[in-house]
Regions:
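Short, low-complexity intrinsically disordered segments enriched in A/P/G/S/L with frequent Arg
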Residues: 14-32, 42-47
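N-terminal beta1-alpha1 ligand-phosphate binding loop
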Residues: 55-64
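Conserved anion-binding
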Residues: 80-83, 98-210, 215-218
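Conserved, mostly hydrophobic/aromatic
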Residues: 68, 127, 179, 195, ...
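Glycine-rich phosphate-binding active-site loops on the catalytic face of alpha/beta enzymes
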Residues: 75-84, 130-133, 184-185, 226-249
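N-terminal amphipathic alpha-helix/helix-capping segment at the start of soluble metabolic enzymes
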Residues: 38-56
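A short, Lys/Arg-enriched amphipathic alpha-helix followed by its capping loop at the start of a domain
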Residues: 67-73
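Extreme N-terminal basic, low-complexity initiation segments
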Residues: 1-11
């Protein structure tokens, strides 16, 4: 991944970000223009994956945030969906120190006031729309929060083929800075796996993360199959629902990097 684009993707939210430098502004322009001409070298056939963005979702404990930060995780996810065993309150998330990782809030609701208020309370750098939020909802959030701060989740299994998925990504691209492709047909954290081979050669208008049942045992193969810009771990690194296992976090990063973390 070109370093200027990587810096842009890891910019913080309002109040914590510096003004983008010239190279970062160029990356922003490339993103806004859409298409697949992003200057990104993604891993293929065993090439290095050290520049992948790594997100760890479902964080609730300071000790695990410390572990993730020490291992080089880029983004930490806080789930604001009451039905999830990994849910936290905005106040609890605000009390947790992300140790330099970008703070991502995961929402299944389309209650825009709640999303906006939580983004402020929990000091979120990114907002992940992980439900059936309408385009109108995303457009409003893009105006109030900034489109580059939105991560739009799509489920490849909903589409008859890759081209239909690409068309829907284009439809949402104006109100998203990044996509996340998850397993199943809704929700997340189920442990179901995305078919990486089915995403090989995907033409995406924005950088995208691969999610869905990623574990230390399968993440390297999944990345090499479809070359995402990053990965999102959740249930695959747990000893039980809602409880992350530090040894599995280390094992997953070791599997990705091909060396001890």
């Amino acid at each position: 991944m070109e370093e200027s684009l990587r810096r842009f993707l890891l910019r913080r939210g309002p109040g914590t970000a510096r003004p983008p430098d010239r190279e970062s502004r160029g990356a922003v322009a490339s993103l806004a223009a859409g298409g697949i001409s992003l200057p990104i070298n993604r891993p293929q056939n065993g090439a290095t994956v050290n520049d992948l963005l790594i997100k760890l979702c479902g964080m609730r404990e300071q000790a695990l945030l410390d572990c993730a930060a020490d291992l080089g995780v880029n983004l930490c996810g806080f789930i604001f969906a009451p039905e999830s065993p990994r849910a936290v309150t905005p106040e609890r998330a605000a009390a947790l120190d992300s140790r330099g990782m970008l703070r991502v809030g995961v929402f299944t609701t389309d209650d825009m006031r709640f999303i906006e208020a939580t983004a402020a309370t929990a000091r979120l750098d990114r907002v992940q729309l992980h439900g059936d939020q309408s385009v109108t909802c995303a457009e409003r959030l893009s105006r109030t929060l900034g489109a580059e701060r939105l991560i739009r989740v799509l489920w490849p299994r909903r589409y008859p083929d890759r081209h239909a998925l690409e068309a829907d990504m284009e439809r949402h691209a104006h109100a998203a800075g990044m996509f996340l492709l998850d397993a199943g047909t809704s929700g997340g954290g189920s442990g179901q796996r995305v078919d990486g081979e089915g995403l090989r050669g995907l033409h995406a208008p924005r950088p995208w993360l691969l999610a869905g049942g990623l574990t230390p045992e399968n993440v390297r193969e999944a990345v090499e199959a479809c070359a995402p810009h990053g990965v999102d771990f959740n249930s695959g690194l747990e000893s039980e629902p809602g409880r992350k296992d530090p040894s599995r976090i280390r094992a997953a990063l070791t599997a990705l990097r091909g060396k001890s973390s």
